[in-house]
Swiss-Prot record:
The lineage of its organism: Bacteria, Bacillati, Bacillota, Bacilli, Lactobacillales. This is Glycerol-3-phosphate acyltransferase. GO terms for cellular component: plasma membrane. Pfam families: G3P_acyltransf (PF02660). It is an enzyme of class 2 (transferase). InterPro entries: G3P_acylTferase_PlsY (IPR003811).
């Protein structure tokens, strides 16, 4: 029973539509009606500004971390904490509190890694921010970091680099979350191809997108 309750709690925690609620209750704006219509960090940053964007990222990030750590704090050790983190990702992507139309799972997935493999997270964050500096695009940085995660989660354990051993559930969740992130960015990839993707106000914009 405790296991079922924790899975439900992880899903409900992930379902909290941070950006949507911040926009509605503090800015009087429905993010669905602005920008890309997404309630994640990128659109929140673009529509509501850096403070709201940073707050959205932080809360969405911590949803993944809390969902991963809470079972361990409650003494549930016979099940991998990653299972609960995965349900937080599902909640974030398909939130019951927002008509099952959620974010792209980047921040929440990163939060899970903080609770389970922090040094691996640092590696992926380096990839993300380095790509962000080169391209000025959060979307492309997210896709590249997700792609690198899918590749390295299969390679690093064999090299005993950052990931000591193969954990089947960890590999499965990283591949699943990474694939979900890439799929959720399909429209962004089309805009990148057309050179019309939105940019952050810094970086080199090496792909020469036309919008700022």
């Amino acid at each position: 029973m405790k296991l079922i309750l924790l899975i439900i709690a992880a899903y409900l925690l992930g379902s909290i539509p941070t950006g949507l609620w911040i926009g509605k209750y503090f800015y009087g704006k429905n993010l669905r009606d602005y920008g890309s219509g997404n309630m994640g960090t990128t659109n929140t940053f673009r529509v509501l500004g850096p403070k709201a964007g940073l707050l959205t990222f932080t809360v969405d990030f911590l949803k993944g971390t809390l969902a991963t750590l809470l079972p361990m704090w409650l003494g549930v050790t016979h099940i991998s904490p990653l299972l609960f983190g995965f349900f937080a990702i599902l909640g974030h992507t398909f939130p019951i509190f927002a008509n099952f139309k959620g974010g792209k799972a980047v921040a929440t997935s990163a939060g899970i890694l903080l609770g389970f493999a922090p040094f691996y997270l640092i590696f992926l964050l380096f990839i993300f921010f380095f790509t962000l500096y080169l391209t000025s695009m959060i979307s492309l940085s997210s896709v590249i970091a997700a792609s690198i995660a899918i590749i390295t989660v299969l390679i690093f354990p064999a090299l005993h680099f950052l990931l000591k051993d193969y954990d089947f559930l960890f590999v499965l969740i990283v591949i699943s979350a990474g694939s979900l992130i890439i799929i959720r960015h399909r429209e962004n990839l089309v805009r990148i191809k057309n050179k019309t993707e939105s940019l952050v106000p810094f970086g080199l914009n090496i792909t020469k997108q036309k919008t700022h």
